[in-house]
Swiss-Prot record:
One of its GO terms (cellular component) is virion component. The keyword Disulfide bond does not apply. Transmembrane segments: none annotated. GO terms for molecular function: nucleic acid binding. This is Uncharacterized protein L533. The keyword Nucleus does not apply. Keywords: Virion. It comes from Acanthamoeba polyphaga mimivirus (APMV). InterPro entries: RNaseH-like_sf, RNaseH_sf. It is found in: Virion.
Amino acid sequence: MELLDKAVTDFQLFYQKILDLYESDFSPADKWTEIATHIHDNQQIPIGIYKLLRQNDTVNQIDIDYKSDLEQLNSKISLESDFIVKSSLIIASMHFIIYDMITREGNYSSIMYGSEEMNIPSVHNMIYYVYISTKNQQNIYFHAYILLFGLESIFNKKFYVGMDFEFTNKKIQLSQLNFEHNVSTKSIIMIVSPNELEDIMMNNFIKIIICNTNIKKILHGSDSLDIPYMYTHRLDGDPDKIIKFTRTLIDTRFLCEYYKLNSDIVSDNRCSIYDEDPSRSAVYFFKVISDEQQNKLAELLESMPAPHDIQWNIHKMPISQARYAAYDVLYLKVFYYRIIHVATEEDSSDIGKKNIIELYKHLLNEITRFVYLEQNGITLLMAKCKEEVDVVNNYFIRNSEGITKMIDIFNQVSLGLETSDPKVNVDSFSKVNHFKRPITTIIKRIVYGFISYRCRIYKDKSTIWTDKLDNQFIFDFLAKMKFNYLNKMFKELSKTLESRIVAICSVR
């Protein structure tokens, strides 16, 4: 209890200094510098509070008070005795102060208006403040802001961060991060150089943003450079950190590809998030941007070198390059929701729309996360499945129709597979190259598992294969990894597959 009391006292004193600086006679620029410096120099206090709050389930019952003004919040803080509630009030007050400071003219690099940049009425009141750390000493603003965002996420689990990275000769140069708040109409786009962040800044960024499962991270086409960079260089190949990061990762490229590949009116699956050619621009295809906005974007892109020729240097970025970098994350959250909205328009029934939302928000994201973990050797389910099926592909059964190889049984029983909860057509699912091999590998392993129990199998003309392949480890893995929708899908598929195999094999 003494430790808790000390933490509360320290946090309140920490906040009081922020309040004193905010109410001082300094200019807005000097206020923000002093506040950010104070937060940076005393980062152990908000980090300590973050750890304490994350360990307490009571936070799930409390909402941050975004409605009260600063005077009302300060009055509530002085009267409140409960540690959790008092902390939430202090965090609300910090939100009020920091969002006021960071959006004051002179304290940001540029500004983008939702009404000018996007064709979606729901974001026309949004303002995107772009901040670029052109000098190393300015990284304290990034540090102060992410500490606040991480603290807020303890009570507010509807945060998104749009993420992108820029590389020169495959070496990281920039991180662009669009911090999307579900209550505020102000979004903050931070552009920093990871190479120039102090260790404590990067460590806290990883801890309270990247590995924070309360915050969803949105990327687009991240498999070639972004994911390997994050897994290897930022998360140090640590499976625990990588799994936490990946658990709330969304890659909109694969949602876009799924939609296009399963649409009757689309002839290709090109999903560049934006492009000077309208036919290749995904945000234009899904009507996130208008004709006029597409033309403006095309003019910017035409003025730039080819993407692989761009030399990125955070200290020497022309306006066009800085705007290009901001666009990479500006659209991501809106684009994500727009894909889902467009997909739901193809079904008029409430249950149909619900099934589509479930597919896009959960199942497609889970399979994307699963594939990233498997491709990078963090989890090894596919490797185990492949190891067990490859050696028995040509083993066979005998029945009234003659000899049938196990691989042929798989090809026969895996046609036309569907599930009802979640509502999935496996053939549609497998049209996305990213998904095809993992889905096929797991289904094949399930099929061979049932064959091993239900059929008399021969290794050759005279040798019976007696091994039994239990499928339970697949479902145990999916449950452990919290791939709940994938788990339900494969369990339902397994029932269908078992019944089909029983019809083919002689039951012992």
